[in-house]
């Protein structure tokens, strides 16, 4: 969920935006803005050469019975984000105990490394296959690897958001992947004229894959963004997958 939901469920949310040489400040207390605007703009509280946004918030104990964060979920999300953005470094610090826990997440292999991590306890059949392309203003990248397992594990992301129920980008990937494999199988003579095509389940048996797209105007089903709904995402993913495979 986005900042509007976090704001509504927090005792306070404090924001500092570093942009165009200045630090701008905003603050909300139980969803109500407490910073006065200056000529319709957030006030400047300092100068800086940096860019970025710093957000501090405190979950509201009047809404939540428990306000302690689950560190494993926070770490997992940070690590996932590092895989999806190979040039990004994320620093995790937990200062709640007597000693600060400090972890640096940086994954220069990107989603190739993500697939390797997903398969680290499984027997793999080949090196990770990776490709990336752009069409219709949509960037598509995917990585996959087959294992000796009998199920598929395909994860879909749009703009770094995990789509637990998949969506159009996953549909495009699956459809074209099956089409290309069938065409290749017939070209090699593995499938004869009298043979039926492999099904999608046949082709993806044992596959681990990560499909990540960057979309300028994504549409999701539901507030939690579990499923991508853009038809152009299906076309873009299908075209890039078909061209690269």
Question: What is each residue range found by the language model?
Answer:
Residues 1-117:
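GHKL-type ATPase core
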Residues 42, 72, 79-81, 87-223:
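GHKL/Histidine-kinase-like ATPase module
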Residues 56-58, 155, 239:
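Surface-exposed beta-strand-to-loop junctions
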Residues 64, 162-165, 233:
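Flexible beta-alpha connector loops of hexameric P-loop NTPases
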Residues 219-234:
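Helical (often loop-to-helix) elements that flank the catalytic cores of nucleotide-handling enzymes
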Residues 231-245:
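Flexible helix-coil linker/hinge segments at domain or subdomain boundaries
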């Amino acid at each position: 969920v986005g900042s509007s939901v976090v704001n509504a469920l927090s005792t306070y949310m404090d924001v500092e935006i570093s942009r165009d040489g200045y630090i701008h400040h905003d603050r909300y207390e139980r969803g109500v803005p407490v910073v006065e605007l200056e000529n319709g703009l957030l006030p400047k509280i300092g100068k800086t050469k940096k860019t970025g946004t710093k957000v501090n918030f405190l979950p509201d104990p009047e809404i939540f019975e428990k306000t302690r964060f689950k560190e494993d979920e926070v770490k997992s999300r940070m690590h996932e984000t590092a895989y999806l953005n190979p040039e990004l470094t994320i620093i995790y610090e937990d200062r709640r105990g007597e000693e600060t826990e400090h972890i640096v997440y940086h994954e220069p292999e990107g989603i190739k490394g993500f697939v390797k991590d997903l398969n680290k306890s499984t027997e793999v059949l080949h090196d990770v296959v990776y490709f990336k392309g752009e069409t219709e203003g949509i960037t598509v990248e995917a990585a996959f690897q087959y294992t000796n397992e009998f199920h598929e594990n395909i994860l879909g992301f749009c703009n770094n958001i995990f789509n637990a129920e998949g969506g159009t980008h996953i549909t495009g990937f699956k459809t074209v992947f099956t089409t290309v494999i069938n065409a290749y199988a017939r070209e090699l003579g593995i499938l004869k004229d009298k043979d039926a095509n492999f099904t999608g389940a046949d082709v993806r048996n044992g596959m681990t894959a990560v499909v990540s797209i960057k979309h300028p105007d994504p549409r999701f089903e539901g507030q939690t963004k579990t499923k991508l709904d853009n038809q152009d995402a299906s076309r873009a993913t299908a075209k890039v997958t078909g061209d690269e495979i």
